[in-house]
Amino acid sequence: MKYIIVTGGVMSGLGKGITTASVGRNLKNKGYKVTAIKIDPYINIDAGTMSPYQHGEVYVLKDGGEVDLDLGNYERFLDTELTRDHNLTTGKIYQTVIDKERKGEYLGKTVQIIPHITNEIKDRIRRIAAKSGADVCLIEVGGTVGDIESMPFLEAVRQMYREESPENIALLHVTLVPIDSQGDQKTKPTQHSVKELRELGLTPHVIVSRCKKALMESTRSKIALFCDVPVEAVISAHDSADIYEVPLQLENEGLSNYLLKKLILKSTLEDTNWEEMVIRMNNCTGNVNVAIVGKYTHLEDSYISIVESLKHGAIEIGCKFEITWFDAESFDDDPSEVEKLNGFDGILVPGGFGERGTEGKMLAIKYARENNIPYLGLCLGMQLAVIEFARNVVGLDGANSSEFDENTPYPVIDLLPEQEDVVDMGATMRLGDYEATLKAGSLAESIYGASLITERHRHRYEVNPNYVDRIEEHGMIFSGKNKNRMEIAEVPSKDFYFASQFHPEFKSRPGRPSPPFKAFMGAMLKKSKEKKDQ
């Protein structure tokens, strides 16, 4: 097994995740099977109970793992499926070690950071890498070198570096090269970051320098001199117009070839599919405008998979798109604000939890339905679509979800039966892959081109089956079902009205877009052309 460790210095948010994913993509293009592990040094067991404002979107894996959004980038760039084990957290490691201590597995020894915690980290990494069957395992260490939370993980990496053969491990350090008021690129932050890394016993083989513009040769040479790496190992990772251009940029910098040389590997393939996809993306014509009405719109990373899925659909049909974000609470406060949705080619309501903003979202859904604007609802976006339809079309005044109103006279959305006795919040929802059978002749079947699909879920509430017949009598049909569970709602009388209990955005890939997002993008493009022809 070959290991590539990715660390970061100077500050957080430099793009270690995209760098890791891009390195992996380029190695895959060279013919190697790649897997990736994300280390998050927080004490939470997983990301499932975190607010999106803390770390952005909670990404859901096929096995139901609720993980850091970086694993979404790994899956999209590598076109692979990971598991919950691929996200290591301090909480998971400590919980395992404490459980072992309680079982007496340490034979009465004093349990310490070294060797017990570090051994558990190393064992996890090696076990995950071996189980994946990959040729190369990328390991991104979250946080910044110097953070106290990261110390046990960096020590484990140091030990791995000592234990593995030199040709089996490479250390890649991502740093920042800022520009001063005179426009000069400054190397001091990088020098100090590498110095701090060395104090921990780690010497980087490659330095990836994040900067606004391409590194000047003088800057590159200075970093090489003071950080003791070859000039060709100083990589310019300057700002790109789109994250999908980063693998091409790093390839042009010679990074993958340098890593192959370090790891004594040979290129067995030159896959150009990624490059061709980027060319198609940059040659898209036409434009559609989509309104996203959500609860966490102040941080776009809260909906990163949705944005990327829209991009995948747009690339596939060859159009550009622009997103306008709307805070659903603004519609709560002033319902007339919903008129701002006039003129959009499509409206999307994403998932979420809690009552805040739900009435505003339903105003947006109603506006889409009444004005025949293409609508895509995801998870809560489906539940609210059902509530809105029940209130305003079926005539069930006061219909609601029991999540928001326990005393509603018409609980058209209710708690999943298996959730009734659940007390803990973490990892207790209906999570991960579940199948859905699609109704023949429905929009859903035409979108997927199949009668049976598998998608990822994350919810505690569902459409109450006691109201299904009554709702369907008035024109909304449930075209996707998992036994007696409603998975997809659509209104056939509208040009495009599709809402799913699942999250199709988690399975969308560049070059292989999620069917609902591709169809939604197509419906918006059609709407845009119709407006121009009027």
Swiss-Prot record:
Catalytic-site annotation from UniProt: C379, H503, E505
Binding sites annotated in the UniProt record for L-glutamine: Y53, G352, L380, G381, M382, Q383, E403, R460
Keyword Hydrolase: no
Annotated binding of UTP, by residue: S12, K186, T187, K188, P189, T190, Q191, K222
Catalyses which reaction(s): UTP + L-glutamine + ATP + H2O = CTP + L-glutamate + ADP + phosphate + 2 H(+); L-glutamine + H2O = L-glutamate + NH4(+); UTP + NH4(+) + ATP = CTP + ADP + phosphate + 2 H(+)
UniProt KW keywords: ATP-binding, Glutamine amidotransferase, Ligase, Magnesium, Metal-binding, Nucleotide-binding, Pyrimidine biosynthesis
Domain Glutamine amidotransferase type-1 intervals: 289-530
Residues at which Mg(2+) binds: D70, E140
SUPFAM superfamilies xref list: Class I glutamine amidotransferase-like (SSF52317), P-loop containing nucleoside triphosphate hydrolases (SSF52540)
Key word Acetylation present: no
Entry binding sites for ATP: G13, L14, G15, K16, G17, I18, D70
Annotated control of activity: Allosterically activated by GTP, when glutamine is the substrate; GTP has no effect on the reaction when ammonia is the substrate. The allosteric effector GTP functions by stabilizing the protein conformation that binds the tetrahedral intermediate(s) formed during glutamine hydrolysis. Inhibited by the product CTP, via allosteric rather than competitive inhibition.
Quaternary structure (record): Homotetramer.
Function: Catalyzes the ATP-dependent amination of UTP to CTP with either L-glutamine or ammonia as the source of nitrogen. Regulates intracellular CTP levels through interactions with the four ribonucleotide triphosphates.
Other notes: CTPSs have evolved a hybrid strategy for distinguishing between UTP and CTP. The overlapping regions of the product feedback inhibitory and substrate sites recognize a common feature in both compounds, the triphosphate moiety. To differentiate isosteric substrate and product pyrimidine rings, an additional pocket far from the expected kinase/ligase catalytic site, specifically recognizes the cytosine and ribose portions of the product inhibitor.
Protein name: CTP synthase
